[in-house]
């Protein structure tokens, strides 16, 4: 059998890869997340509006190009759960005030309501999924790509669509 040849280009590639991985881990730890568990991975670029309200438990993974809009609501992802690219999390919602245009109200009078989003253990979330305020995804559930989760998903269910509907449990 032939030996694997380590050409200078291959060595440079691996060194660059290792450097970028270490640099990425340092950046994530400096974000000030509420919890960043052991072996958790938050791939960059990811936009988080309030990092102190994001809780990633052990062995969780969120791939890059994700956006988490959370001002007072919390986003909690428990052990062994993962999300593919372009996850969109929105913990806030606002109710319109009848008779008064929204843009005319001062910020203190806007009827915003933020609710926590909880992803239980061992959940798979596909690419381009949107999680809206109050969503609770049960243990072992699978969320299909491009789904809109606006209600609770029971444990060990497969949910797809916009809005999500249960196709298997």
Residue ranges and their predicted role:
Residues 40-42, 62:
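Hydrophobic, membrane-inserted alpha-helices
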Residues 47-56, 61-135, 162:
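Flexible, glycine/small-residue-enriched loop-and-beta-strand segment within the central core
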Residues 134-164:
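C-terminal/domain-terminus segments
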Residues 1-33, 37-39, 80, 86, ...:
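Terminal amphipathic alpha-helical/low-complexity segments used for targeting or macromolecular assembly
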Residues 23, 72, 144:
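Short, conserved clusters of charged catalytic residues that mark active-site
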